[in-house]
């Protein structure tokens, strides 16, 4: 007689929290409807540098550069997520120690059963190393283009001397 399958146990709040906290390559946290940090995972702690008790209740704009805060980017991101169903972008953010890191950000609205906005889910990934590699590749490509152009210009110059 075959074994009966074990009963399915959906994720409880505790198990879901364990799942989110196990993800260390992404900062996954919730903001309330005003943009204050309402939850914090180990990935956020790892690359932003804040412990949960240091950041809960703080407005998420503290992760933005002064220039982006001055330009109103944090509020525009929340407004876009609330109105369009999602905000996605890349930019510089700040760690607790003040150092900058380049990141990819996704913000999704969280709504209650009546459709009212109750907060936002925010997922951030540190892309600093990838961006540095892209910048190095771009520089290398530019240098190669300049070299090819210089060789081409020199060849044209030499050919023009031969035909004179």
What is each of the regions a protein language model found here?
Residues 105-107, 124:
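Sensory-domain boundary capping and coupling elements
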Residues 162-164:
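Conserved small/polar residues in nucleotide/adenosyl-binding loops
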Residues 92, 108-113:
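Output-coupling edge of small sensory domains
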Residues 15, 56, 67-99:
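Terminal output helix/cap of sensory domains in signal transduction proteins
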Residues 1-15, 113-116, 125-142:
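PAS-associated C-terminal cap
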């Amino acid at each position: 007689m075959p074994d009966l399958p074990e009963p399915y146990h959906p994720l409880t709040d505790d198990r879901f929290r364990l799942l989110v906290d196990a993800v260390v390559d992404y900062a996954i946290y919730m903001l309330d409807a005003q943009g204050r940090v309402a939850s914090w995972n180990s990935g956020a702690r790892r690359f932003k540098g804040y412990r949960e008790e240091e950041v809960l209740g703080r407005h998420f704009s503290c992760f933005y550069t002064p220039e982006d805060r001055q330009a109103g980017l944090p509020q525009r991101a929340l407004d876009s997520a609330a109105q369009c169903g999602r905000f996605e972008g890349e930019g510089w953010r700040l760690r607790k120690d003040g150092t900058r890191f380049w990141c990819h950000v996704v913000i999704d609205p969280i709504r209650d059963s009546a459709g009212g906005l109750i907060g936002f889910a925010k997922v951030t990934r540190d892309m600093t190393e990838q961006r540095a590699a892209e910048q190095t590749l771009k520089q290398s490509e530019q240098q190669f283009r300049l070299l090819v152009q210089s060789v081409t210009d020199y060849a044209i110059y030499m050919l023009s001397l031969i035909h004179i």
